[in-house]
Amino acid sequence: EQKKAKNRLASLEKKLVRLEEELQKIEEEKEEVNKKYLLAGEKNDVDKLMSLQEELDNLDNKILEKYQEYEETEIELKSL
């Protein structure tokens, strides 16, 4: 039972690290899309702006999901 708890603890800690890395990648991707968005805004490319806005919205949703997963993992980790 104790070994099970230790394994679970290690697994959750790894998951937190993985989630942090995933969040960082998504944030970097969002930064790139924001740059494209600004360029499209300068060119007044409405179609491109709409497409990029949709991409930004999707990235924001991914970020929220990852933060939620991170919080749930932290809570489980603290309960062990």
Show where each model-derived region lies.
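Charged, heptad-repeat coiled-coil alpha-helices that serve as long linker/dimerization "arms"
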Residues: 1-80
